[in-house]
């Protein structure tokens, strides 16, 4: 009798596990389908001498070139620039090398990326624009302004991955590489981690202390979860993420003193990528640059994003009158 009861209990446990697994997989298929549909619309491909470049344009008014960070694509750029669109700017957001529909060429260095940004400006008949580089998009943003200064009206660096003395040999923690290697190859594993290991993803991929998330206003927590969710499908961004990871561990010092354009750099002191020190060093070596730093917020500037957007919009308005570029196609 006892054996029979044990078998029945075991069978019930197995059945519950199967049903639970089917429900989980059903939810995954629904959500990954929605994310794939999201990135499948709203962008175009510009065929340029630098290769095909995916991009999207949103809003009206003065144009701004938005260069996304790691784990991104044109969609991340649009999300980052949503406040700019709301404030009357026209945002051009591309997918950098290895992200979504922009292929990874043999030379995917920040220098080659900077030249590709110029190719996109040419394709869209844009002359001189403000450049916004976020996170791992900062190196190519700086190099765009250094290599092609005639195309850059102003520069904004948001939580920039950049050089600072003593950081050249610094490697990300082992947990970072474990999470990257585990999740990059599988949309399902990343999706699962986003449900059951959010704290780990916040600390590694999003470089934001979990306490900053817990202490942020509701709308900021919703923004953070949206950013985490919209890294899916991560498999469509894998090549770009690996390229950014390689670049980020050995960024050289650029000739910052040669930059002669209005510049603002924004970061948070507890950004786990260390962008506060990097950003402050960068601003200190660009003539007239302004550094805006927050004590908390992490890499996502949680709790300070609205303030940062006000700073950003004000800065861009101040430089708006410097040029009247052509409209993007």
What does each of the following model-derived ranges do?
Residues 8-45:
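An N-terminal hydrophobic leader/cap segment in hydrolases
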Residues 57-101:
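Conserved HGGG/HGGXW glycine-rich cap/lid loop of the alpha/beta-hydrolase fold
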Residues 112-129:
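Conserved acidic catalytic loop of the alpha/beta-hydrolase fold
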Residues 129-169:
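Conserved hydrolase catalytic core segment
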Residues 175, 184-254:
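Alpha/beta-hydrolase
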Residues 259, 265-267:
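Short beta-strand/loop motif that positions the catalytic acidic residue
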Residues 272-278:
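Conserved alpha/beta-hydrolase "acid-adjacent" motif
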Residues 291, 297-309:
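Catalytic histidine-centered segment of alpha/beta-hydrolase-like enzymes
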């Amino acid at each position: 009798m006892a054996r029979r009861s044990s078998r029945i209990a075991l069978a019930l446990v197995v059945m519950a596990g199967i049903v639970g697994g089917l429900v989980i997989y059903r939810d995954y298929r629904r959500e990954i389908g929605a994310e794939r549909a999201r990135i499948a619309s709203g962008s175009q491909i510009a065929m340029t001498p630098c290769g095909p470049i995916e991009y999207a344009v949103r809003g009206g008014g003065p144009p701004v070139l938005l260069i996304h960070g790691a784990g991104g694509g044109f969609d991340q750029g649009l999300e980052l620039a949503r406040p700019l669109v709301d404030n009357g700017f026209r945002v051009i957001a591309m997918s950098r090398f290895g992200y979504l529909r922009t292929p990874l060429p043999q030379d995917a260095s920040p220098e080659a990326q900077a030249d590709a940004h110029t190719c996109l400006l040419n394709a869209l008949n844009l002359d001189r624009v403000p450049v916004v580089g976020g996170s791992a998009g900062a190196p190519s943003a700086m190099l765009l302004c250094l290599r092609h200064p005639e195309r850059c009206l102003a520069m904004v660096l948001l939580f920039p991955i950049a050089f600072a003395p003593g950081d050249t040999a610094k490697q990300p923690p082992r947990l970072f590489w474990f999470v990257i290697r585990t999740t990059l190859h599988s949309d399902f594993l990343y999706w699962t981690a986003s449900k059951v290991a959010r704290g780990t993803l916040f600390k590694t991929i999003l470089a934001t202390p979990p306490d900053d998330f817990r202490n942020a206003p509701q709308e900021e927590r919703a923004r953070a979860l949206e950013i985490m969710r919209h890294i899916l499908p991560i498999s469509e961004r894998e090549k770009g993420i690996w390229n950014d990871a390689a670049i980020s561990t050995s960024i050289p010092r650029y000739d910052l003193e040669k930059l002669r354009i209005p510049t603002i750099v924004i970061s948070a002191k507890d950004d786990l990528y260390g962008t506060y020190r990097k950003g402050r060093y960068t601003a200190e070596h660009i003539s007239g640059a302004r550094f805006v730093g927050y004590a908390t917020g992490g890499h996502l500037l949680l709790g300070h994003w609205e303030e940062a957007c006000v700073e950003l919009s004000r800065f861009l308005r101040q430089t708006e009158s410097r040029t009247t570029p052509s409209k993007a196609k």
